[in-house]
Amino acid sequence: MKRTKNINQEMFRKEWRTHRLAPVALAVSAVFFLAGCEQTDETVSLYQNADDCSSANPSMAAQCTTAYNNALKEAEKTAPKYATKEDCVAEFGEAQCTQTPAPAQAGMAAESQQGGGMSWMPLMAGYMMGRMMGGGAGFAQQPLFSPKTPASPANGQFVDASGKNYGNATTGRTMTVPKTALAPKPATTSTITRGGFGETVAKQNSMQRSSASSSSSSSRSMGG
């Protein structure tokens, strides 16, 4: 009986250790799992043109040019459009706007859009370049615009077509952004009035500040 009792006690101790370690192992696994899920940021570089990119990355001159040209095409489709040059200049400044075909109205056939007039859009002031989403070997790009008027909430800064702000319009900067920043923006389907894009930028600025504040508060709470 004594031998049986000793064996039972040993088995109990092993089971107790196993049950006690299991939650710890699960907690550690959960931390690594969450860390993997949260890696949704991408390191990107901001350039004003392909030459700036090539100078900073001599071995990637071809990729720099391709990304720049693709960004120009994206800008034509997604940039804010204005019915008049005056409205565009009021938001982006003198010599910062160019004429472009009027945006295709949603739901209308492309043939019916031909000869439908012209509109005005800001010149592309730079572009964002980063790795393709999904970890591919290629690069993704995003056109950037930069208002040159003191009244604009993004004066002298890089913003994308959605109005999201990426800081000073300085070429060669590297920063971390959500991977969604490199996702293609929807094509513009209507013109906006003077001040309309500025309002969009102001809303985005407010959202970015709120998000940064929430992240900071969360970090402080986790830090104890």
Curated annotation (Swiss-Prot):
Region called Disordered, residue ranges: 178-224
Family matches, as Pfam families: DUF1190 (PF06693)
Biased composition (Low complexity): 209-224
Alphabetical list of InterPro entries matching this protein: Biofilm_formation_YgiB
Protein family: Belongs to the UPF0441 family.
Protein name per Swiss-Prot or TrEMBL: UPF0441 protein PC1_0312
